[in-house]
């Protein structure tokens, strides 16, 4: 029979279908199995309203047949089949979809058909140098054979087939230096591809598999009898068909969920929480999500890939769909299955459509609620989770200029100096005395050191708690939030600000105490100016402190950038010039202050310089800052001891 041209006759278009749309050759089998499933769906749907079909759901199957000698792989189904006209229309026209037409014709029915764009069939040519299709439409007496070797066209002629359905025979290419095509004829290679992509197709995918068994023992058994083995073939169903995520939660045990998670996501530990979510309405999907009990080794590196496995009607479309999860929930693993997603023609990349956004938003809300439930009902487990992934939630609250802070703030935990345990911000606020003006915090490298800061001790002496922040992101997180909800004395909604104990006015002094400090600063202006000059630009100001009790000196920051934030930012490339405006605060009631005054009054400028450098270095050490010149500091200490 004469060869026909493809209706979309451009060879360039066929090359694009074969070489550009699909990035992974093994997905050809996923596409052909999905097409077979669609064909069965159509006949099964017809059987529900037409008893003459004479078949029920258990009669349908997809059969894979491999022949290494002839290098063919055949995918057969007993679905609706195709007429000659349908073969020309569906296979002779690139990017025409019979499944899409079927969905349009039955748009008022609840039918789940996978195929939409009609190019999946052409992925066959990635692995086959010739493709033969034999099909017989249901209700027809004729079968037809369609055959093509690629872009040059196809041939169509009568054929023989007993029952309705379709056989797709792939003549597999020989191996090359770069491609192992033999894998598509290998028993284990085929099984692996089916399990990966098509494990949840709802009809059995079957293949003859070679097995071994012991031959029957002779009777009577001779004394020198040795067991003998024989090989045989057996038709085996390769796919599990019923996805665990489509089952009701009451039908699945915790152990089954845990085993599924460990097997699917290659984890050795049970998940910390299982989240089952299914929605019908604006977004139709089934989701099975897991909160891991420990973080992957690469979680906080650029190599980590977030994302959920995305299925369309049980067929794997994407192993890690990043668009389904916000970054702050990137630790969540799981599966989403939807029949409503708009897929592009390769099924490998999703369009940025509204349906995906709806699912993303629904999952975000569900995950947040589940974490809240864990926090409220299983605090020990939540705190274990927090040790692994808490930093990610804090990054989420800080990122995008605090856009997600309100969503995440009640999931955050911080160490309480007073309670000596992790607390939420709400728990801190609930225990605040009525007169307390701020949520106090101190930021540094260890809770022990922070608790001993002069300003932290002062706050705690007042009976107020201090949150001790030890991770780089902590202070940035609180500063971007700025306030937290708090009801006032009359029960009206209000807010309370966060306050670094080493920055600005702590709100602990009376007006009289503030006035006295200001007067003392004015009275000692000459001394403080001399000390500021001696420190040569290292501090913005020297003044009398209202936050010191037993210590002689401390550093505070004037402005939005704290000393701890300076330390964090200085570690970043290109941030070497970022400096906080430091204030050297002195305790006028400490004996050291009298020594300073004596040096000033004696006109001993050199000694005052040394004292200023010593006190500044001491304040740096208290803050956990490196001393600017350790050698000079050591020499100054020694000279004072002589």
Enumerate the predicted regions with their spans.
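GHKL (Bergerat-fold) ATPase N-terminal catalytic module, capturing the glycine-rich phosphate-binding loop
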Residues: 1-184, 192, 215
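GHKL/Bergerat-fold ATPase module in large chromosome/replication-associated machines
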Residues: 113, 131-153, 173-183, 188-642
């Amino acid at each position: 029979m004469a060869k026909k041209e493809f209706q979309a006759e451009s060879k360039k278009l066929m090359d694009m279908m074969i070489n550009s749309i699909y990035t992974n050759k093994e997905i050809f089998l996923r596409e052909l199995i999905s097409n077979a499933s669609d064909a069965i769906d159509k006949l099964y749907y017809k059987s529900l309203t037409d008893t003459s079909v004479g078949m029920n759901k258990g009669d349908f199957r997809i059969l894979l047949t491999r022949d290494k000698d002839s290098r063919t792989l055949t995918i057969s189904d007993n679905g609706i089949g195709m007429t000659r006209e349908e073969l020309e229309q569906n296979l002779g026209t690139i990017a025409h979809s019979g499944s899409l037409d079927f969905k349009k014709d039955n748009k008022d029915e609840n039918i789940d058909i996978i195929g939409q764009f009609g190019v999946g069939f052409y992925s066959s040519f990635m692995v086959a140098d010739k493709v033969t299709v034999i099909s017989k439409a249901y209700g027809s007496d004729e079968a037809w054979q369609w055959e093509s070797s690629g872009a040059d066209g196809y041939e169509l002629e009568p054929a023989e087939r007993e029952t309705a359905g379709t056989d797709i025979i792939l003549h597999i290419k020989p191996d090359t230096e770069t491609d192992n095509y033999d894998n598509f004829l290998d028993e284990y290679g085929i099984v692996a591809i089916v399990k990966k992509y098509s494990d949840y197709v709802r009809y059995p995918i079957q293949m003859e598999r070679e097995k071994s068994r012991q031959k029957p023992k002779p009777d009577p058994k001779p004394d020198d009898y040795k067991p003998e083995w024989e090989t045989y073939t057996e038709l085996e169903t390769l796919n599990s068909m019923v996805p665990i995520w489509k089952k009701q939660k009451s039908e699945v045990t915790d152990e089954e969920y845990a085993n599924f998670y460990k097997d699917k996501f290659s984890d050795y530990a049970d998940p910390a929480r299982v989240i089952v979510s299914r929605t019908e309405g604006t977004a139709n999907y089934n989701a099975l999500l897991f909160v891991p009990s420990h973080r992957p080794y690469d979680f906080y590196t650029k190599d980590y890939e977030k994302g959920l496995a995305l299925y369309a009607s049980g067929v794997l479309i994407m192993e890690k769909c990043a668009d389904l999860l916000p970054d702050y929930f990137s630790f969540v693993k799981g599966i989403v299955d939807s029949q409503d997603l708009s897929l592009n023609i390769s099924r490998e990349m999703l369009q940025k459509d509204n349906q995906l956004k709806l699912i993303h938003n629904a999952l975000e809300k569900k995950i947040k609620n589940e974490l809240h439930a864990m926090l409220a009902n299983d605090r020990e487990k939540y705190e274990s989770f927090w040790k692994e992934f808490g930093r990610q939630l804090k990054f989420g609250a800080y990122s995008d200029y605090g856009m997600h802070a309100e969503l995440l703030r009640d999931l955050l935990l911080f160490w309480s100096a007073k309670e000596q345990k992790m607390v939420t911000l709400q728990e801190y606020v609930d225990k605040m005395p009525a007169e307390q003006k701020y949520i106090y915090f101190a930021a540094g490298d260890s809770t022990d050191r922070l608790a001993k800061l002069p300003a932290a001790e002062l706050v705690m002496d007042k009976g107020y708690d201090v949150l001790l922040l030890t991770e780089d992101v902590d202070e940035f997180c609180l500063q971007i939030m700025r306030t937290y909800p708090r009801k006032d004395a009359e029960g009206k909604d209000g807010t309370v600000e966060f306050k670094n104990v080493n920055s600005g006015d702590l709100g602990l002094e009376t007006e009289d105490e503030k006035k006295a400090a200001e007067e003392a600063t004015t009275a000692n202006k000459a001394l403080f100016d001399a000390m500021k000059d001696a420190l040569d630009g290292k501090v913005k100001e020297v003044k009398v402190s209202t936050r010191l009790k037993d210590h002689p000196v401390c550093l505070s920051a004037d402005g939005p950038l704290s000393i701890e934030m300076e330390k964090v930012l200085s570690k970043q490339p290109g941030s070497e010039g970022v400096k906080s405006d430091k204030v050297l605060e002195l305790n006028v009631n400490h004996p050291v202050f009298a020594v300073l005054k004596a040096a000033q009054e004696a006109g001993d400028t050199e000694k005052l310089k040394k004292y200023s450098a010593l006190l500044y270095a001491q304040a740096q050490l208290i803050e956990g800052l490196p001393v600017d010149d350790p050698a000079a500091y050591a020499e100054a200490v020694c000279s004072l001891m002589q």
